[in-house]
Regions:
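Perimembrane helix-loop-helix junctions
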Residues: 39, 52-89, 156, 160-161
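Membrane-lumen/periplasm interface segments of specific transmembrane helices
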Residues: 75-151, 155
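Signature aromatic-anchored transmembrane alpha helix within multi-pass, membrane-resident enzymes
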Residues: 58, 85, 208-223, 256-295
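Multi-pass, polyprenyl lipid-linked donor-dependent membrane glycosyltransferases
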Residues: 1-15, 45, 51, 186-195, ...
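Membrane-interface alpha helices of multi-pass inner-membrane proteins
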Residues: 19, 31-49, 53-58, 86, ...
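Aromatic/acidic, Gly/Pro-rich catalytic loop(s) in extracytoplasmic/lumenal soluble domains
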Residues: 387-451
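Membrane-interface transmembrane helices that cradle and orient dolichyl/undecaprenyl
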Residues: 14-32, 42, 64-68, 156, ...
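Short periplasmic/luminal acceptor-recognition loop of GT-C membrane glycosyltransferases, typified by
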Residues: 285-368, 383-398, 442-447
């Protein structure tokens, strides 16, 4: 497993939650200090993590549940807040010592520029970030409604159909539809739906205050961490459920101790067990038949590796491996380790594989909005980089068909990734600086400036 920013985010977040609960249970300010500093540090794993400061609400909720004094609550919040600021200032101080502060500030300026971009060619505008969350929760709600309707049919049939010969086919149909639903929907949506129901069930129905508090913590993790991602929780995957899922499971296991009106306890437990079994089978079938993230197709086809020391243990299909191996062999005579490589398209890993430096400080310049992209290229004054471009769309589970015309017209524009406006910007840069083609095949083309 790669130890990347989202994983670091979840690790530090759960650690901070652990210490804030120790502080609440033992009434020791030291733990609030540790928790606040960790949250401050975590703000630099991903900039949106600054919103993790919102876990201070757990201190307020604890005061409300346990009827603690306002003075005690305020003191805890102040200690946590000051510690949070200390964590941030500590990282900034280290940045200045190591010479990282100026690049960080420049990056922040660019992020603010991107957030305000209204050109329609940037993936991480503020409006896109907000809409992503709304869209995802809308899809989760739709899925939840479908599941509930199937449950109603299941429970209703058990109550009103007395003949087993009729009841059995109805149940088979219901759970077959449920299996199809789980297979077709995003796995993360299903996790979210079941986690939310379980967490909210604990918060509303469970009388144990500790369980309520832990459920609030799990809910905060699910709600906060996806903020700042253009794909919402889809991009974060299952790591946002480290707290929420255990609390949801605790609710489902405790149903026999909780009275739920109009639904027999045996029916709920039986349905949940069947649902869990179907979900596991559907996920297994999906993983085997439907491929993995950005690499569709049956899993047994992923037997071929890329001839590169850095990714040789990552397996893909024969076709994809061949495409990438041909690329690496073809560009090897023209670039060397430490060179600047301007890789335009959805191919940010090429800098990593070739040990080259990303041009304009970004390994995925396709994500930049057209105004910022144009500004960076027009104001660049250093040595000209090698330019690598792809002739096909690689976003999604399957590679698109290559086309010679793709370098000019990417066809149907899909959001911020495939944009003819940005194609014109890079074509102008190539023409202005008199680049020439040194390598080209069906899928890629490499340009070098004339000497």
């Amino acid at each position: 497993m790669t130890f990347y920013n989202d994983l670091i985010t979840s690790l530090l977040y759960t650690t901070a939650i652990f210490y804030i609960f120790k502080g609440l249970n033992r009434n020791k300010y030291l733990y609030f200090i540790i928790s606040g500093i960790i949250i401050g540090i975590n703000s630099f794993s991903r900039i949106p993590n600054i919103l993790d400061y919102g876990i201070i609400l757990l201190v307020i909720l604890h005061a409300l549940y346990y009827r603690e004094t306002v003075c005690l609550c305020i003191n805890r919040c102040l200690v946590f807040t000051v510690s949070f600021i200390i964590g941030i200032m500590g990282i900034i101080s280290l940045m200045k010592v190591w010479g990282h502060y100026e690049p960080f500030v420049n990056n922040m300026r660019e992020l603010l520029f991107i957030a305000e971009d209204d050109s329609g060619t940037s993936s991480h505008t503020l409006s896109n970030m907000i809409f992503a969350q709304v869209r995802i929760y809308y899809l989760v709600l739709k899925l939840g409604i479908k599941i509930v309707l199937l449950y109603i049919i299941f429970w209703g049939s058990a109550k009103y159909i007395k003949k087993e010969v009729v009841l059995l086919p109805v149940r088979i149909i219901v759970f077959s539809l449920l299996a199809i639903l789980f297979y077709k929907e995003n796995v993360v949506f299903t996790l979210c739906a079941f986690s939310m129901v379980g967490i909210l069930g604990n918060i509303v129905l469970n009388k144990d205050k500790e369980i309520k508090m832990l459920s609030w913590a799990g809910l905060s993790m699910i709600m906060i961490i996806p903020l700042g991602s253009d794909g919402g929780m889809v991009n974060n995957g299952s790591i946002i459920y480290w707290l929420g899922m255990p609390m949801a499971i605790s609710f489902y296991l405790s149903i026999q101790n909780i009275h739920i009106p109009a639904i027999p306890q045996w029916a709920v437990r039986q349905t949940l067990l069947l649902t869990l079994g179907i979900y596991i089978l559907a996920c297994g079938a999906k993983a085997i038949c439907d491929g993995v993230y950005f690499d569709g197709g049956p899993l047994f086809e992923k037997r071929y590796s890329i001839q590169n020391d850095r990714v040789k243990h990552i397996y893909t299909s024969r076709e994809r491996a061949q495409i990438l191996n041909d690329l690496l062999i073809g560009i090897k005579p023209y670039i060397k380790q430490g060179d600047h490589l301007f890789a335009y398209g959805s191919i940010p890993a090429i800098n990593y594989m070739t040990r080259t430096k990303p041009f304009i400080g970004c390994s995925w310049p396709e994500l930049l909005g057209e105004p910022l992209f144009r500004h960076k290229l027009n104001n660049y004054s250093g040595p000209l980089p090698a330019i690598l471009r792809q002739k096909f769309n690689s976003i999604g589970k399957e590679f698109g068909e290559p086309s010679e015309n793709y370098l000019i017209d990417c066809g149907i524009e899909t959001g911020p990734f495939r944009s003819n406006k940005k194609h014109r910007v890079i074509n102008e840069f190539i023409e202005k600086n008199k680049y020439k083609t040194v390598f080209e095949n069906q899928y890629f083309v490499l340009y070098l400036p004339e000497k």
